[in-house]
């Protein structure tokens, strides 16, 4: 991808996503990763950072991942925010991840398997 880095925005309140990825062998040199440990002002944060990849935990305060996703997609539909190229649910709960996929996420993966996702191999 040349010298253009891909931008990753993660909403995850319990685990350091960068640490999970690096320990899983992902080379993050082409990625710019930003993690927020809560979902305060989440839509403003997405709008400011303009991520290529959005990672959403479900059980995170104050707004759960599923509600963040629904709200975000409403704003996208209203042309008020640019949709990230890929949105992944990264809950440890497969039921929560399935719910996010039904609501419009592009996919999901348990956060501890995240380093194995094909998105890092591009």
Descriptions of predicted regions:
Residues 52, 77-87:
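His-Asp phosphorelay/catalytic-motif detector in bacterial-type signaling
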Residues 23-27, 45, 99, 103:
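Alpha-helical interaction/dimerization surfaces of two-component signaling modules
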Residues 35-53:
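Acidic, metal-coordinating helix/loop segments flanking the phosphotransfer/catalytic sites
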Residues 45-48, 118, 122:
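CheY-like receiver
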Residues 28-34:
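A generic structural motif
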Residues 52-76:
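Conserved phosphotransfer microenvironments
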Residues 67, 89-117, 121:
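Alpha4 helix (beta4-alpha4-beta5 surface) of REC/receiver domains from two-component response regulators
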């Amino acid at each position: 991808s040349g010298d253009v880095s891909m931008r990753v925005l993660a909403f995850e309140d319990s685990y350091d996503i960068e640490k999970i990825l690096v320990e899983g062998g992902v080379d993050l040199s082409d990625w710019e990763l930003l993690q927020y440990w809560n979902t305060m002002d989440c839509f403003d944060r997405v709008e400011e950072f303009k991520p290529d990849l959005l990672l959403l935990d479900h059980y995170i305060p104050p707004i759960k991942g599923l509600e963040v996703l629904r709200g975000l997609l409403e704003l996208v539909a209203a042309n008020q925010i640019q949709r990230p190229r890929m949105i992944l649910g990264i809950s440890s709960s497969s039921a929560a991840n399935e719910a996010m996929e039904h609501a419009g996420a592009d996919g999901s993966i348990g956060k501890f398997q995240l380093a194995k996702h094909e998105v890092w191999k591009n």
